[in-house]
UniProtKB/Swiss-Prot annotation:
The protein's name: 23S rRNA (uracil(1939)-C(5))-methyltransferase RlmD
Role, per record: Catalyzes the formation of 5-methyl-uridine at position 1939 (m5U1939) in 23S rRNA.
EC number: 2.1.1.190
TRAM domain segment(s): 41-113
Region described as Disordered: spans on this chain: 1-45
Annotated residues for binding of S-adenosyl-L-methionine: 340, 369, 374, 393, 420, 441
Alphabetized PANTHER family for the sequence: 23S RRNA (URACIL(1939)-C(5))-METHYLTRANSFERASE RLMD, RNA M5U METHYLTRANSFERASE
Species whose genome carries this gene: Psychrobacter arcticus (strain DSM 17307 / VKM B-2377 / 273-4)
NCBIfam families documented for this protein: PRK13168.1 (NF009639), rumA (TIGR00479)
Keyword Iron carried by entry: yes
Keyword Metal-binding among UniProt keywords: yes
GO biological process annotation, one example: rRNA base methylation
Gene3D superfamilies: 2.40.50.1070, Nucleic acid-binding proteins (2.40.50.140), Vaccinia Virus protein VP39 (3.40.50.150)
Amino acid sequence: MQPTDSKTSTSDTTEQPNETQTITIPPSKKKSKPSSKTRRRLKDAEPLPFAIDGLSHDGRGVAVYGNGFVEADGHITDKHGKKIFVSFALPGESALVKITNSRTSFEEGDAVNITANPNPERVVPPCPHFGVCGGCNLQHWQPEAQINFKQSVLAEMLVHQANVAPDHWLEPVVGDRLGYRTKARLGVRYVAKKETALVGFRERSSNFLAELNECHILDPRIGFEIENLKTLISTLESRNKIAQLELAMGEYLPELPDGDQPVALIVRNLEPLSDADIDKLKVFFAARNWQLYLQPKGADSIQRIALTAADDLSEQFGRLYYQLPEYDLTFEFIPTDFTQVNLSVNRQMTKLACDLLDLKAGERVLDLFSGLGNFSLPLARLVGETGSVVGVEGSEAMTIRAADNARRNGINNTEFYSQDLTHDCTDKPWANQGFDALLIDPPRSGAWEIMQYLPKFNAERIVYVSCNPATLARDTKALLEQGYRLTHAGVMDMFCHTGHVESIARFEKVSA
């Protein structure tokens, strides 16, 4: 794999650390705890010195116990060759490591001090909560290094599972490195002893909520309102009964109705709220022009709360929007819909996918896992009125939303169908008309079931968008066996500062 240079976002600033860096990490509250005897031993144990030799696929440092390794108490360990996965450590560094979890085949730990050879790509994390909060795990590493590492993960998995490398590596797709996340679920818990509410992500490897005042990964419309949300919830009579906030944000479009605010929060309340509590929420949300929803039970119980007398509650949800200006498209969605969390990367991703398919006017395209039309509609623009796009999606609600978005954007060369794609659907009328190109954007589990019947579509070109490089590599092997060649592959930094790898690959049918 050739090294690549990624673009630098103006929203990201990094500071170089000192020659040594102390990282203060609170005791880890593990979900699956070792025995009480082991817990006491780990808690009392002194940090141990290790040389960091490499990185795991999730971005943790990897070290190995050497022969005759001497622990701090002078005892010579018998763990020769045992691996330790070390959070916050980078290759080449010497670190003092606090062991937090010990298992038969490996151990886990935190780097509490970099004692020598700090990696030149190490930076000071921009967020004050980094190391405690589990929302991200790579802020100590330059973003450019992160994305190159993610490409190396993809390359390794393609070789390991499919014994292949692409003909061409794509330039990594990068966008905003901070303030990019427009969808999330934040936990809520009121702590009576501190007389305050906690709002945010869970601590690393724990069910406990991290004590946050702000979040640098969330869109700043919410990320810098966390302290205000904590204060608000602390004043409610039902502060002990608020369990979660589900947030969704769209883009602000001046031409849209005033009632369609670009920020929506669903408050998961475990018991009905009093009128006084609802009034407090309404005042807070109205001041920020946010949509307010309450959810006392399942998804069907979500109820929008009117903030003014003019609010139209004839439908369960207000609308949110995002755009793909390259294709003159505006998408409408509701807060519970699946959408990509990074709008700037999504714009680049859709264009890249369309470019890779190299469509011509009049061609037929199949879009599997089409959602609300994020790829289908740009593809429809490219094939023109003489071409067509068929979108297939498991969710009937999303299928309806996609058709609505097509109609709203004046697109009439698309068809959308709701179908369980884990079963062979090639006997359906829409499936047997032949396709020139195919786009697939499956969930993390990949598209193994589809690989079994995909040859029946007889597509010349395939673009596969993946949120899990392991399943992409597995499915790549199946495509190679079916007569396709991997022409292009690359990664997209949809979740910067995390170990999450979003990738894209193009396949071309080999001529007989």
